[in-house]
Amino acid sequence: MPTRQSTSWVFTLNFEGEIPILPFNESVQYACWQHERVGHDHLQGFIQFKSRNTTLRQAKYIFNGLNPHLEIARDVEKAQLYAMKEDSRVAGPWEYGLFIKRGSHKRKLMERFEEDGEEMKIADPSLYRRCLSRKMAEEQRCSSEWNYDLRPWQEEVMHLLEEEPDYRTIIWVYGPAGNEGKSTFARHLSLKDGWGYLPGGKTQDMMHLVTAEPKNNWVFDIPRVSSEYVNYGVIEQVKNRVMVNTKYEPCVMRDDNHPVHVIVFANVLPDLGKLSEDRIKLIRC
């Protein structure tokens, strides 16, 4: 299976007792982290490596035997801010090295939006809506907190997400009764950097959203009213890493070297006539 590589990673390190000392070395360009408490004590942090090809194994190695959960940081500036947010902070933040910003056209568009959103709304309503959507998502991400004890099924999901994704496994969270915390957990999970949220829908609409962020992990939160119409085709496209967008300007996106996590939250069991049983990791609420 291809190995994930990146310059920038975000990490969460759970601990008990004394705050762990992080032994960063010359392979690290920059790091920031802080002590947070949301149900339990943990360090939340962000690391930039000097090498653009730092693997997950190499990133874990610098923690000298500690066992953090690491994910690739898609937006370095947002990741840095999230690692130093005031909400849930107990101590810190602490920094190591020199942070390197990335110039981006996206940031320039957001600067235009912030400076004169009303003008953008008139001149380009579509661009305005996209910028507004991104801003609202960032605000939610920065203010997101999980102030509940994890239920056993939620802990099981988190353990699965600590493993490397593959091209087949689909995590299916099944809870027929309702009020088990599926949607709340799905929304919280989708606010993590590198994750997207889909409530179901038509293939064209869903794939248009997926191909806008093709490297994301994806949460499919299926409403009870749509349980009979789960879009298995989209789920398989995302897992198989060959994604077809036929809306507006048809295109095919291939991402063969980058498997992602896919989680379905539903009130129904998977239809084994539409997904092979060996693909499903079933978790019951």
Curated annotation (Swiss-Prot):
It catalyses: ATP + H2O = ADP + phosphate + H(+). One of its GO terms (cellular component) is host cell nucleus. A motif (RCR-3) lies at residues 82-85. InterPro entries: CRESS_DNA_REP, Helicase_SF3_ssDNA/RNA_vir. A motif (Nuclear localization signal) lies at residues 52-74, 99-105. Signal peptide: none annotated. Divalent metal cations, possibly Mg(2+) or Mn(2+). Residues 3-99 form the CRESS-DNA virus Rep endonuclease domain. Keywords: ATP-binding, Covalent protein-DNA linkage, DNA replication, DNA-binding, Endonuclease, Helicase, Host nucleus, Hydrolase, Metal-binding, Multifunctional enzyme, Nuclease, Nucleotide-binding, Nucleotidyltransferase, Transferase. The active site is at 82 (for dna cleavage activity). Its cofactor is Mg(2+); Mn(2+). Initiates and terminates the replication only of its own subviral DNA molecule. The closed circular ssDNA genome is first converted to a superhelical dsDNA. Rep binds a specific hairpin at the genome origin of replication. Introduces an endonucleolytic nick within the intergenic region of the genome, thereby initiating the rolling circle replication (RCR). Following cleavage, binds covalently to the 5'-phosphate of DNA as a tyrosyl ester. The cleavage gives rise to a free 3'-OH that serves as a primer for the cellular DNA polymerase. Belongs to the nanoviridea/circoviridae replication-associated protein family. Homooligomer (Potential). Rep binds to repeated DNA motifs (iterons). This is Para-Rep C6. It comes from Subterranean clover stunt C6 alphasatellite.
